[in-house]
Amino acid sequence: MSFKALVNRAVAGRRFRYYLSRLSAYPAFDPLFDIVANRLGPGLRHICELGFVPDLVIDVGAHAGHWTIAARRHFPKARFLMIEAQLEKEPSLRKVAQTAPGRIEYALALLGPEPRETVEFYLCDTGSSLYQEQTSFSRQATKMAMTTLDAVAGKAMAESGPILLKLDVQGAELDVLAGGTAVLDRAEVVILEASIVAYNAGAPRVAAVIAQLASLGFNLFDVIDLRRIQPVLAQLDLVFVRAGGRLEASAAAIIRHYGSD
């Protein structure tokens, strides 16, 4: 029996689940469970297993490009467009793009619902946003020009098939989507971060995000990360799929056959 088969057998066993549930009662194991809750890799793999292969992946809030690197392992034939507002991340994004010339591109732009000459933007490394964080991390307010997702992604999606759109913009996800109607028309999957608590001042929280995505024609499909700050569940990474699309059809087929084996 292979190592993978042994692991699968152990994990599926009742005894393993029993002892895992016992460990969850001990606070010392909380960091371990928080790590296990980060399921980006399995989440993307499940999308592939259900038959969805994007032609174009748009990574909004790319930061240094780490998400694109991780996602490309699951979608090696897709083209990637990384979009980041922080100008100082350009060397990192360029380095990632150079790993796959012609397959990975990047753009430096602050996205929002409409073009504006200047808006206030809060620089805070991974927490940079249109909405000021409620944390104690140091930040710097600056003025930047704003454009839209459709304007930046127009060339990349001109000849593309289905799109996977990822957004991690610290509370400004709905603002970006408001300026990305053409992208959404072609998207089958939207992955975004949403806050359970008031993490960014004035930013919509998870219930409002789910409701807005539903109004745009996307249903919640998976939860691939839970971010805790001590005992507080602060943020979730959510996967939405097009209502009535191929992924919902694949999921429905699995549910229909559940119990028939």
Predicted feature residues:
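Phosphate/nucleotide-binding beta-alpha loop and adjacent structural elements of enzyme active sites
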Residues: 1-261
